[in-house]
């Protein structure tokens, strides 16, 4: 099987390239000219199953090699300002639609798109207004794939809009569409300012970690587990389903993850809680249900603690 991975120089992309190559699949890694992380893909050039393609998404019609499956990760405007920029997100929508048409020309049969938990739009304030400040996450309905979607950001709105647009286009072109609602992924190579990266760095050095209250429900999936989930979604009979939450098996209060990292590193650094300004889209409240993913054979092999041990 030959796989095209767009956004291959990203954190998720680099790990997926490595994972699919480990499964003896052919990988076409598509990156833009100045992509951060591009150089980290050069180590695979000696592998005859790997091909690096330098091409901007705006020129995607120039892609001239056939493939079987597309995993579309490339996306502009993922930072704080970009997530709320409607024009940037419109460009992403247009690029994804054009890419699917190219997939038809190049013989692809399945198209996996990196959707997001941001499509749900559920926030801590939503939960507190409905259940009060002393909520119990075990009594709050989980976010299954048919859970109401009320995205707060232009980023989330764009990802959600593509769910129906790409599904309909895929049906008309004879391409099976898979919409992956990816939750919070961690692992080596993640952004150095992420909560996990910050906690590991500071606790390793026995330094304090300054964070917000972290009282919302959260879900982490380790990058190796995510790669396995995406691999299954690229290969398995999906039994008519096309929307899948891609997340870990456990939903927990965010602060509990922070405490686990401190414990695993046996750190003398303290957890310092500070009042932090929430993003304009609010504090996400993540409590996904992954039964759809489990039905196609997904088992979380690593989980949070083993994943953290791998990182440290």
Regions found by a protein language model. Give the residues of each.
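C-terminal substrate-binding subdomain of Rossmann-fold SDR/epimerase-dehydratase oxidoreductases
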Residues: 203, 207-312
């Amino acid at each position: 099987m030959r796989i095209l991975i767009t956004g291959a120089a990203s954190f998720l992309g680099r790990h997926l390239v490595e994972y699919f190559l480990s499964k003896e699949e052919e990988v076409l890694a598509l990156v833009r000219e100045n992509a951060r992380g591009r150089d980290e893909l050069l180590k695979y050039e000696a592998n005859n199953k790997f091909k690096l393609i330098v091409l901007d998404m705006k020129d995607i019609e120039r892609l001239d090699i056939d493939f079987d499956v597309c995993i579309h990760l490339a996306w502009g405007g993922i930072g704080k300002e970009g997530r709320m920029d409607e024009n940037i997100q419109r460009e992403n929508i247009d690029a994804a639609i054009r890419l699917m048409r190219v997939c038809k020309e190049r013989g692809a049969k399945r198209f996996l798109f990196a959707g997001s938990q941001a499509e749900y739009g559920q926030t801590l304030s939503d939960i507190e207004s409905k259940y009060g400040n002393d909520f119990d996450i075990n009594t709050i309905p989980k976010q299954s794939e048919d859970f109401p979607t009320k995205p707060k950001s232009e980023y989330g709105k764009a990802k959600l809009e593509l769910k129906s647009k790409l599904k309909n286009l895929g049906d008309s072109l004879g391409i099976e569409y898979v919409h992956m609602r990816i939750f919070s992924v961690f692992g080596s190579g993640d952004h150095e300012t992420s909560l996990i990266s910050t906690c590991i760095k500071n606790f390793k050095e026995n330094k304090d970690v300054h964070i917000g209250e972290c009282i919302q429900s959260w879900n982490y999936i380790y990058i190796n587990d995510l790669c396995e989930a995406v691999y299954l979604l690229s290969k398995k009979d999906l039994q008519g389903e096309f929307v899948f939450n891609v997340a870990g098996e456990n939903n927990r209060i965010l602060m509990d993850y922070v405490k686990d990292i401190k414990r695993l590193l046996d750190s003398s650094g303290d957890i310092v809680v500070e009042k932090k300004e929430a993003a304009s889209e609010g504090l996400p409240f993540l409590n996904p249900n992954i039964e759809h993913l489990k039905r196609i054979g997904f088992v979380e092999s690593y989980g949070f603690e083993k994943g953290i041990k791998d990182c440290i």
